[in-house]
Amino acid sequence: MNSPLSYNNVIEVTDLQRAFKQGEHEIQILRGIDLIVRRGEILALLGPSGAGKSTFLQAIGLLENGFTGSINILGQEIGSLNDKERTAIRRDHLGFVYQFHHLLPDFSALENVMLPQLIQGKSSHQAKEHAHFLLNSLKLEERLKHYPSQLSGGEQQRVAVARALANRPALVLADEPTGNLDEATGDIVLHEFLRLVRRQGSAAIIATHNMAMARKMDRIVTLHDGRLIEEY
């Protein structure tokens, strides 16, 4: 079997569909999505609230079941994997950034970024060294020992970015990553996020309703009513 690093396409999605039951009715959320994202590519998933962006990210992030179609990550067909194998894919190859930071409140900024590395099997020294590098790169060198409650919103989200990149994921999934920040702070966080993603050579899919933000990515696809309707 080829190494995951040998695959140029980080993710390939074919005919992805998702429907929910609402009483006697079936509500179609995703309607046959096809998408390929290549190694190192940063893709904007543009669409209004309710378009299906979060549902799509949950599907390709292996956070939900109940989808039909095919999801292939680094050459592995997800439908053929058991729960343990899917967890390993999430842990080793995917990173997540959300609108709200979801940091562990009883852990410092440094510890929040070390933790996913320790879970992956890194030594404490390795995890600490890489966490230092990421947080320093995000201009948080004076905040390493601070707890989330002691950080500003922008600082919290930068820690969340560092945590998402801690295991050098092949693919980062970000759902409105600056949606809870004011415009000026959001621009700073996004700039630093994109800089680090590119430096690590990760691919990324960033869901947003903001065209100005989307234009900063390598490619834009538009999701509307569960369908990809534009690409540019």
UniProtKB/Swiss-Prot annotation:
GO MF entries: ATP binding; ATP hydrolysis activity; transmembrane transporter activity
InterPro entries cross-referenced by the UniProt entry: AAA+_ATPase, ABC_transporter-like_ATP-bd, ABC_transporter-like_CS, ABC_transpr_LolD-like, MacB-like_ATP-bd, P-loop_NTPase
Membrane topology, as annotated: Peripheral membrane protein
GO BP: any one term: protein localization to outer membrane
Binding sites annotated in the UniProt record for ATP: 47-54
SUPFAM superfamilies hit by this protein: P-loop containing nucleoside triphosphate hydrolases
Domain ABC transporter: 11-232
EC numbers for this chain: 7.6.2.-
CC annotations in GO: plasma membrane
Alphabetical list of PANTHER family matching this protein: IMPORT ATP-BINDING PROTEIN, LIPOPROTEIN-RELEASING SYSTEM ATP-BINDING PROTEIN LOLD
Protein name in UniProt: Lipoprotein-releasing system ATP-binding protein LolD
Source lineage: Bacteria, Pseudomonadati, Pseudomonadota, Alphaproteobacteria, Sphingomonadales
